[in-house]
């Protein structure tokens, strides 16, 4: 959904966007700015139920259960709308998974962007193949040594 001035009004944050923010990586400022706009009700941010699971398990593996719970609790306090599994989202996610080389969780996250006609904010190379189906904001990828 777009504003009258042509700017996007609806966004979906991928797990990588949240991790960028939590770990203060390049692009964290972009995520923070979007969250501030959502708080001021200038935009709407959706986050897939799959994102909550991804944040939990990735953080659990790297930093332990306590930090995983802390991050999910913080996400629950943000001005975002959690997109739960629905029949319509399931069909869209299933179609994406069947036709693209994409993980199960990323299929749900991308389906959320398709369903809400939203711009997906991410830094996950898997989403590059979907640029004909969704609008994206690509955050800077991690630099490798």
Q: What is the predicted function of each stretch?
A:
Residues 1-10, 110-145:
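Acidic, PIN/NYN-like endoribonuclease modules and their adjacent C-terminal/linker elements
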Residues 1-47, 60-73, 143-145:
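Short, well-structured N-terminal submotif of metal-dependent ribonuclease cores
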Residues 18-19, 52, 127-128:
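A generic structural signal for short hydrophobic patches within well-formed alpha-helices
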Residues 39, 76, 114:
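Anion (oxyanion) recognition and catalysis
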Residues 58-61, 79:
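Helix-loop "lid/cap" segments that line or gate small-molecule binding pockets
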Residues 81-121:
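Active-site neighborhoods of divalent-metal-dependent phosphate/nucleic-acid chemistry enzymes
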């Amino acid at each position: 959904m777009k504003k009258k001035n042509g700017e996007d009004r609806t966004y979906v944050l991928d797990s990588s966007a949240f991790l960028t923010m939590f770990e203060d990586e390049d692009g964290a400022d972009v995520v923070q700015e979007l969250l501030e706009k959502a708080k001021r009700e200038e935009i709407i941010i959706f986050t897939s139920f799959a994102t909550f699971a991804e944040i939990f398990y990735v953080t659990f593996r790297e930093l332990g259960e306590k930090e995983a719970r802390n991050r999910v609790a913080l996400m629950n306090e943000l001005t975002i709308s959690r997109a739960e599994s629905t029949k319509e989202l399931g069909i869209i996610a299933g179609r994406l998974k069947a036709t693209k080389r994409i993980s199960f969780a990323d299929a749900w996250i991308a389906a959320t962007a398709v369903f809400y006609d939203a711009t997906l904010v991410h830094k996950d190379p898997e989403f590059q193949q979907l640029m004909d189906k969704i609008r994206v904001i690509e955050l800077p990828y991690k630099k490798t040594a």
